[in-house]
């Protein structure tokens, strides 16, 4: 597998799965999926082997690293991938153990005994488990030494004096307070961070009201540490040991992604997903779910007693009855509204959205851009808009009025064909006149012979800018599809009385027609936003460059003892006042035509400007 064949990965925590022929050969977890997977392709050794053998990569996003650890462990146990050889046997996995004592302590162990202790795991990443233990040891005052009760009472240790232990070994611990700490640690390790955070915040506020600011500060640090590592809730499992499937759906135009997670014994052990095409034309979430259920569950070898859905669909009762008869027991389809099960569905929804975005980006990268087909359909274009040109203006109170033109082909920027225009003959802000002039120069000047006509023109602006561009098209006798994109609500401005089809109507009087508002995830809108953002940045950066050059020239005109040749030489070597002011005297003196005396004069002049409050 090559790096260029990877799906577009999010920069978020999760689990990634290298597969060969559909079989997992390596499963790993990451705090940042994008960075971690990229590292495998740069490394040699074992990473080089499984990246070379893999023919696909899959990923599951999680809320935090702890959840990723748990999910990774369950998937490795389920699939036993070849290149996770060191982690295959459960007896080698590290567990976190809360001992069964009057004052429990937290330890890392690789043996699970029937000793009444509470075990959490297994975890395949020993270093990450130690980090979790270190955080709990630092922030929760559990005892750190073993062997209670002691024959001889020791002196209080450093942890006690630092507030990191309640001191049971010196009989200083309140059993009730210690029990509360133990309950907090259990809740965190079971994935119930939210109530712990809420209680810690309440205790912190109470300490502050009592003016015990040292204790309030400790509690504040504890809250921040818990929120950073655990988030507000864990979602990789539920507390009860149950079997169920939970589904998530994401849609973008005619494309949809359904992801199904299998939860067995209260823990996620696997996932299936489908990338669906043809969901356009009014298909709602229920219809997409119905199509997936029909495809998946008619082939499934095991159906759990409960299937959680993000939305209801019309045939759910029929499918529930069919699957119940097939399984020989009741199979329920439910749409949870609150609680643990609703949060499982929310996890599936997030992963479906991330998976859909990844699939769409991969299609775009391979040239099979779904947004171009969506644009053709939405705008009733005669052809797929392979080449799109975007236009925007930039100025500050009418000075240095410029326009930018960017070119996209196949959904990707073609920066070698981007162009910048200095708007001529305008000394006051007039966005409409600037747009008219820019379109006219593009269609009738030298660029008309150098560049092919686009399949679509996008104007960054509202009705006024679109009308000005249409006038320029009409004057140049060019009929190219044109739309605007207004920043407010990302509204698409359509030309012509006959909606978006004016370019198909010969003899139609051109004017601004209606507006179109698409969902933000719609592939067509994604394309237009990408072009708009590129041209806006391009025009603004050009305007800033001209503004800086103008300011630099005006300052150079005032430099004492610096003639025209030296000014031109300095302008060639220094692109901004900041660059010139920061340069040492020796660098300025090295500019052709300059000498040490002239350079010192320049530095002195700029220093005086700064001292007088004039910005450089």
From Swiss-Prot:
Q: Name one Pfam family in it.
A: UvrC_RNaseH
Q: Which PROSITE patterns match?
A: GIY_YIG (PS50164), UVR (PS50151), UVRC (PS50165)
The protein's GO terms of the molecular function aspect are: DNA binding; excinuclease ABC activity
Q: Can you give the residue ranges of the GIY-YIG domain?
A: 11-85
Q: Where in the cell is it found?
A: Cytoplasm
Reported function: The UvrABC repair system catalyzes the recognition and processing of DNA lesions. UvrC both incises the 5' and 3' sides of the lesion. The N-terminal half is responsible for the 3' incision and the C-terminal half is responsible for the 5' incision.
Read off the PANTHER family from this record: UVRABC SYSTEM PROTEIN C (PTHR30562:SF1), UVRC/OXIDOREDUCTASE (PTHR30562)
Q: What's the protein called, per UniProt?
A: UvrABC system protein C
Q: Which organism is it from?
A: Deinococcus geothermalis (strain DSM 11300 / CIP 105573 / AG-3a)
The organism's taxonomic lineage, starting at the top = Bacteria, Thermotogati, Deinococcota, Deinococci, Deinococcales
């Amino acid at each position: 597998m090559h790096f260029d064949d990877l799906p577009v990965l999010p920069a978020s925590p999760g689990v990634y799965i290298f597969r060969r022929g559909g079989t997992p050969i390596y499963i790993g977890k990451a705090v940042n999926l994008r960075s971690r997977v990229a590292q495998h392709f740069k490394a040699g050794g074992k990473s080089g082997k499984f990246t070379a053998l893999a023919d696909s990569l899959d990923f599951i996003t999680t809320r935090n690293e702890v959840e990723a650890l748990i999910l990774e462990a369950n998937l490795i146990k389920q699939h036993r991938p070849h290149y996770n050889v060191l982690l295959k046997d459960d007896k080698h996995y590290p567990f976190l153990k809360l001992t069964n004592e009057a004052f429990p302590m937290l330890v890392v162990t690789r043996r699970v005994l029937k000793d009444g202790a509470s075990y959490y795991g297994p975890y395949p990443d020993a270093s990450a488990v130690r980090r979790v233990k270190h955080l709990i040891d630092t922030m929760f005052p559990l005892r750190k030494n073993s062997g209670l009760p002691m024959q001889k009472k020791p002196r209080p240790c450093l942890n006690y004096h630092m507030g990191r232990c309640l001191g049971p070994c010196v009989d200083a611990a309140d059993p009730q307070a210690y029990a509360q700490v133990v309950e907090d640690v259990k809740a965190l390790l079971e994935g119930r961070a939210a109530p712990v955070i809420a209680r810690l915040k309440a205790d912190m506020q109470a300490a502050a009201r009592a003016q015990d600011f040292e204790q309030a500060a400790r509690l504040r640090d504890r809250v921040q540490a818990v929120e950073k590592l655990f988030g507000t809730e864990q979602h990789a499992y539920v507390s009860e040991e149950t079997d169920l499937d939970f589904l998530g759906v994401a849609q973008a135009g005619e494309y949809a992604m359904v992801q199904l997670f299998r939860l067995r014994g209260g823990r996620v052990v696997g996932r299936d997903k489908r990338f669906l095409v043809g969901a356009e034309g009014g298909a709602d979430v229920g219809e997409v779910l119905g199509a997936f259920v029909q495809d998946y569950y008619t082939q499934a070898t095991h159906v759990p007693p409960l299937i959680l859905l993000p939305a209801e669909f019309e045939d759910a009762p029929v499918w529930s009855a069919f699957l119940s008869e097939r399984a020989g027991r009741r199979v329920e389809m439910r749409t949870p509204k609150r609680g643990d099960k609703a949060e499982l569905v929310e996890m599936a929804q997030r992963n479906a959205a991330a998976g859909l975005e990844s699939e769409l980006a991969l299609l775009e990268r391979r040239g099979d851009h779904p947004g171009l087909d969506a644009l053709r359909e939405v705008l009733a274009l005669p052809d797929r808009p392979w080449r799109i040109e975007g236009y925007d203006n930039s100025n500050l109170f009418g000075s240095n009025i410029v326009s930018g033109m960017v070119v996209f082909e196949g959904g990707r920027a073609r920066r070698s064909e981007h162009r910048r225009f200095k708007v001529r003959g305008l000394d006051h802000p007039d966005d409409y006149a600037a747009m008219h002039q820019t379109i006219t120069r593009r269609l009738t000047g030298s660029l008309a012979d150098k560049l092919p006509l686009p399949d679509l023109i996008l104007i960054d602006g509202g009705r006024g800018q679109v009308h000005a561009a249409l006038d320029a098209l009409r004057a140049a006798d060019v009929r190219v599809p044109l739309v605007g994109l207004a920043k407010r609500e990302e509204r698409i401005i359509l030309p012509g009385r006959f909606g978006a089809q004016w370019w198909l109507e010969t003899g139609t009087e051109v004017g601004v027609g209606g507006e179109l508002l698409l969902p933000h995830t719609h592939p067509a809108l994604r394309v237009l936003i990408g072009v708009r953002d590129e041209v806006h940045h391009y025009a603004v950066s050009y305007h800033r460059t001209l503004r800086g050059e103008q300011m630099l020239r005006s300052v150079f005109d005032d430099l004492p003892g610096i003639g025209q040749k030296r000014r031109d030489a300095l302008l060639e070597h220094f692109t901004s006042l900041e660059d010139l002011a920061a340069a040492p005297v020796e660098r300025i003196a090295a500019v052709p035509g300059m000498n040490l005396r002239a350079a010192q004069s320049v530095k002195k002049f700029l220093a005086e400007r700064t001292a007088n409050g004039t910005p450089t």
